[in-house]
């Protein structure tokens, strides 16, 4: 199992990036969460089989059709305490 904290920058707020992330992560069977940050980025935690987490990273580089992803910063972290994938309140 692999767990990554990802910070996505670019045109990623106001373009349905969080909703798309929830749907995509659930489709891959991942646990974790996604939220907007005050600095205009989106932050997400992905936990699951390595292949599924890597597939999610590839998907995040494209995002939904109206998004423009400029950068992904990826940090390995500890596994989340709760199952499932959710959208957290913005920070």
UniProtKB/Swiss-Prot annotation:
It comes from the Bacteria. Gene3D superfamilies: 3.30.70.100. The active site is at residues 18, 36. GO terms for molecular function: acylphosphatase activity. InterPro entries: Acylphosphatase, Acylphosphatase-like_dom, Acylphosphatase-like_dom_sf, Acylphosphatase_CS. The keyword Hydrolase applies. It is an enzyme of class 3 (hydrolase). Keywords: Hydrolase. Its EC number is 3.6.1.7. Pfam families: Acylphosphatase. Residues 3-89 form the Acylphosphatase-like domain. Disulfide bonds: none annotated. It catalyses: an acyl phosphate + H2O = a carboxylate + phosphate + H(+). PANTHER family: ACYLPHOSPHATASE. Belongs to the acylphosphatase family. This is Acylphosphatase. It comes from Rhodospirillum rubrum (strain ATCC 11170 / ATH 1.1.1 / DSM 467 / LMG 4362 / NCIMB 8255 / S1).
């Amino acid at each position: 199992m692999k767990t990554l904290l990802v910070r996505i920058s670019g045109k990623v707020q106001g373009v349905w990036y969080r909703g798309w992330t929830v749907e995509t992560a659930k489709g891959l069977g991942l646990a974790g969460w996604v939220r907007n940050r005050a600095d205009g980025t989106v932050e997400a935690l992905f936990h699951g089989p390595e292949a599924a987490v890597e597939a999610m990273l590839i998907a995040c580089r494209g995002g939904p059709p109206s998004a423009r992803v400029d950068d992904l910063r990826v940090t390995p972290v500890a596994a989340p305490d709760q199952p499932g994938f959710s959208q957290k309140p913005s920070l």
